[in-house]
Amino acid sequence: MFNLSFGFFGVQIAYALQSANISRIFATLGADPHTLSFFWILPPLMGMLVQPLIGKYSDRTWCRLGRRKPYLLIGAIVAVLVMIFLPNAGSLNLSSALFLGLSGAMWFGLFSLIFLDTSINVAMQPFKMMVGDMVNEEQKATAYSIQSFLCNAGSLVGYVFPYLFTWIGISNIAPEGVIPDSVIYSFYCGAAILIICVLYTFFMVKEMPPKEYAEFHGIEPQKAERGGQESGLFKLLFKAPSTFWTVGLVQFFCWAAFLYMWTYSNGAIAANVWGTTDVASEGYQAAGNWVGIVFAVQAVGSILWALVIPRFKNLKTAYILSLLIGAAGFVSIFFIHGQYLLFVSYFLIG
């Protein structure tokens, strides 16, 4: 079960680097801080498009490399290439070329972000699906727990990379419009870990052929080859219970809040704590590193609160309390001007 999910560790590092640094990268390239949200539309949009497609087509893919593994490998390779090119967008002498008000560097970054988020989704989804494919019902909880642990561990590593590289002496400032070396090397290191972890899972895990898969799940071989799914997406949504829609509505607003956090944390912390909005300044880039640290604190808070929730007799009470605590964390960011006090805000969000 560990081998099945180990690649997820590398994928999550890539995802954490994207979450913590995309606003910083585009602001450094010259994007207006007030329009950063337009760039951030792309990751959830790609997720909405790619995740159902990967599920649909990997259900029907049976080849000598496996069922889910071909998508996993292709997604990882593309993600690695993009992670090498994206942080160098400001170093390619494209800043002078303008189209629709955006410099060539920003267009390069924009298309790189599209490919990065698409490839991360392509690499991420097969790990979740392989647990359903290959783990029996009694062990699925354990398998998903391992995956959750690796997910959080990968997030922590990805978040702290820029701060760590700066701490060991790699430059955290650069000429205007150029991404600092601390961020560039973070993406390089993340790319290396990603491909190593994914290749480990790729070679250590052997997926079931259609006949064995059908026997394992107690379905007809023909149905297994079709993916075992008779209903389309819209039919499944139509038949979904009311609880699905209730939780979905809450999640809708939660993810809206998280998107604000990912988009504007860098600028807000730079202005409130370091007192600067100059993206080329040492203070702004230091704030960018600190974003990774507070995001890591948020991840720790999430892990610890997940251990507390089962102790509630009424889970609805736990979820309501969770939302109120998170809301308090979001509001407090505006009023805090000390970098270490931000630990409280982001811990509450977690």
Go through the PLM ranges and name each one.
Residues 1-46, 245-250, 254-279:
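Helix-loop boundary and gating motifs at the non-cytosolic
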Residues 71-103, 306, 324-337:
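C-terminal ends and interior cores of transmembrane alpha-helices
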Residues 316-350:
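C-terminal transmembrane helical hairpin of 12-TM major facilitator-type secondary transporters
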